[in-house]
């Protein structure tokens, strides 16, 4: 029994490390998962295309979680292939988890019967099992699974709201990498007052301002430079450090984002122009 699914990356509106409340938005950069479920075998194996040495514990745990809930003790194999760079702050783990959960549900023939929010929670549980997240990252998972902007309380895995937003986006990813599980949570908690302000801005629909305040606050908390955000500000509706870095994401209209992209190309690393994504994760 085989299943396939894709899930988008995401950018940050509000980093949840300060208060447990976070918000993110889906980006049109995909991760694809292919899952084979075999009744005659036990155990789960995994591979990540192009990264033979990468840790596959997360996606393997996603398959196991789904089979434990909806299967009958089958074994399985998962292969993911991604446009999303690993450890870059673009929610590669959430995208991989969502795609794997949906692909496994598809392989079991129950993808249409499972609520998408519940499916995202399965991936979050697997991420906690695998130790790849501090907060559970339900905000990232919800944005990737549902599309658009999602705000969540990660302490309860509670979806506070989801909204549809359409932006052009520029993504700058420096050469270095940063792992979410290594983030200095204590320093992030020191900007909790600003995080609460960001949450209020986002709840009022002022996502661009929310992003920008979040970006400046968490650049300070996580020791990333603010210069890339300041460079983008005159041309963007909002700009933020994405997740725990090192990527930055700017959003706005097409002309403004082209200007941001041009300026960010002066830096080492890679720059990508894309758009927000409203459809979320889906089987294929």
UniProtKB/Swiss-Prot annotation:
Q: Does the keyword Protein biosynthesis apply?
A: no
Q: GO CC annotations?
A: cytoplasm
| Pathway info | Metabolic intermediate biosynthesis; chorismate biosynthesis; chorismate from D-erythrose 4-phosphate and phosphoenolpyruvate: step 5/7
Q: Which domain of life is it from?
A: Archaea
Which of the seven top EC classes does this enzyme belong to?
transferase
Compartments where found: Cytoplasm
Query: Looking at the keywords, is ATP-binding present?
Result: yes
What is the E.C. number? 2.7.1.71
Q: Which family does it belong to?
A: Belongs to the GHMP kinase family. Archaeal shikimate kinase subfamily.
Protein's name according to its UniProt entry: Shikimate kinase
Phylogenetic lineage: Archaea, Methanobacteriati, Methanobacteriota, Stenosarchaea group, Halobacteria
